[in-house]
Every structure is written in structure tokens, then in C-alpha cells.
């Protein structure tokens, strides 16, 4: 039985090394695959019962493990929707059948509908822009779509304009003014209306404010500012109702509260008016915190989604599926969601990709070792076969 056992063990060793060569071949083939996780063949011995004075050789068992938790290198790309994770966590993606998986392969691009999909055909899932981390569930995530609607026109209705008017200014001659500033507002079609705001000193602590349409010089709003003679703080007259109705707009409430009359130059500390022209989307950025931000032609930015990350207690125990995606299992533990840079998750890096964690030099070394071991095991089988042939021929 020992010669049969010797041959059986040799075959077992060859099969084991063949498995190792297969994983090495996979690793080498996927050395440039985004998000690929290295496979490794692990060995364990199988001991068979033996009797006193007679050894019954056993065999070797193999098991394939993946280095899912080992991060690969990160390289830069030119696409803002190429995403890599620096640290813990996995992207949550949806397959063609609607099932959800985890992955580190972040080569996402918009499809014809604007949905972000990676090279393996899995769609990136995200949470709402205002979603709280504590309320995250996989079922509550949606496919990230970057075809944001164009910003509509919005007429101006409110603004804040805060200035300092020099206390040393003198009242100008009739028809004159001391200071002038131009502000931009919008009518309901999103067309610009330039407002000229004139400040004219009319008394020791009194100023007249006149708002005119710069296009035709028509006065469309006025107020009188009164300041405290001791502190220079505004006492009354801090609101101007600017009537844009004749120009296709609404009444704009221009707030001058916080303005002062003190020594120094004429300065502006705040000048903001709401409203906007219609604007189409220019591009999409993704922040380290997972915020997917639409950038519009007029410079406006709007958060569309927040990309959560997922993790499990034992990532290396997840089931590997084609396409560099992973399926949580009972051995890996339950999925836990959180936003990047919090909840123990890493950060998302836009314009980068995580490379394969397979090292070509190490794989070639492993291949040579497996080749030598395979050859040695074949020699064991060959020797056992030759000895068996000697035994069979003893009767001749």
C-alpha cells in the first residue's frame, strides 16, 4: 500500500502545484486590471491513518484565498468620474439583475442615460445629497446619474448690500452724488438687469439712496439712511424696494442693514443678490467626502448625491465574482455603510484608479517555485511507478 500511497501523494502534489500555477497565471494576466485582488493558493496536509511499522502517505489539500483587503497602488487619470478609495471601504454597485455587490474597481463613466457604470457593467449607487449617515441602507441607495437638469432662470427677489459711507464726506452740488456701485440682478427670464446704486449725502448723518436701471437711468427704488451721530451705526432706512416689474422681473428687497457711517474710505463688505440666468451643466466633480457635485457653466455648484462606502468585518472572506466585484457572505459578516472620511471609512479620490495588488516580480518567483515543486512531485510519482513495475515483474 505504501507504493500506491507514494504515487497518490505525488499526483496530489502535482494537482496542488497546478492549482498554484493557475492562480499565479490569473494574477499575472490581471496585473493591469483596475481593482483586481490577488489570488493565492494555500496548502494544508491530509494525514491518513497509519499502523505501527507502516506509514500510509497522505496528500495535500489546497484552498484559494483572495487579498481583498490589500490595497493596490493608486494612479492618476484625466476623468473626474474615475474613483479610487484610499483606506477602508468598497463602492456599492448594482448588477444587471438588480442585485448589489461591493467593488474597488472605480472606472465609472456615464452611459447614454447619464448613469455611472464601470467597465464590468456595474452601476454605482449613491445616497441623497442630504442623507444622514445613520439612516443609510443598501435598499435606500439609487443609481448615480450625472445628467443633472439645467438650472432654470430665477428672478431676483432679495439681496444684501453693506457699505461704509465716509463720515467726512460733504454734501455734493445739486444733481451730484458721492458714491456709486453697480449690482447685477435678473428678471424672470434670467436676463441681466444692471442696477446703479447712488449714495448722496444730504445731512450730517443722512444719506439718500437711489437705485436706477443702468440701461435707461430710470429710478426704480429709493430710501433715506439715517445714522447714529455717536456710533455711526445705521438707525433707519435700511431696506430698498427695487421694482423690476417694468423689466420682466419682481420686486427686489435690497437690504442695507449693517451699513455704517464712519471715518475711512467708501468700502463694500457685502454685495449679494439672488437670482440667476439659465445655465447648462459643464461637468461633474466628486469630493473626498463622496459628494457628487454638478458644476454649471455660470459657476454654480449643486450637490446631486453622496457616495457611501461599505465594509464588512472580514473582507477576505467575501465571495469573488467576475468583474472584480465581491459578494458578502456569512463568513465575511454583515455589510456596514458609512460616508467617506467617517465611520471608519477611507476617502474617495476623484481622477484616480486603484491598480491591481498583484506584484509581477512576486508572481514570477511563485511561478518558478511552483514549477520546481510540480517537477519534484512528478519525480515522486515516476519513482513510485518504477518501483511498482519492479514489484510486478518479480514473478517473472
Swiss-Prot record:
Family: Belongs to the flagella basal body rod proteins family.
Function: The flagellum is required to cause a persistent disease in a murine model of infection.
The entry's keywords: Bacterial flagellum
PROSITE patterns registered for this protein in UniProt: FLAGELLA_BB_ROD (PS00588)
Compartments (UniProt record): Bacterial flagellum basal body
Organism: Brucella melitensis biotype 1 (strain ATCC 23456 / CCUG 17765 / NCTC 10094 / 16M)
Lineage, highest ranks first: Bacteria, Pseudomonadati, Pseudomonadota, Alphaproteobacteria, Hyphomicrobiales
One of the protein's GO biological processes: bacterial-type flagellum-dependent swarming motility
Name of the featured protein: Flagellar hook protein FlgE
GO cellular component: bacterial-type flagellum basal body; bacterial-type flagellum hook; cytosol
InterPro entries named in the record: Falgellar_hook_FlgE_sf (IPR037058), Flag_bb_rod_N (IPR001444), Flagellar_basal_body_rod_CS (IPR019776), Flagellar_FlgE/F/G (IPR020013), Flg_bb/hook_C_dom (IPR010930), FlgE/F/G-like (IPR037925), FlgE_D2 (IPR011491), LlgE_F_G-like_D1 (IPR053967)
Gene3D superfamilies: Flagellar hook protein FlgE
Primary localization class, coarse: other
Signal peptide: none
Disruption phenotype: A flgE mutant is attenuated in a murine model of infection. Four weeks after infection, the number of cfu per spleen from mice infected with the mutant is significantly lower than the number from mice infected with the wild-type.
Induction info: Expressed at the onset of the exponential phase (after 4, 8 and 12 hours of culture) but not at later time points.
Listed NCBIfam families: FlgEFG_subfam
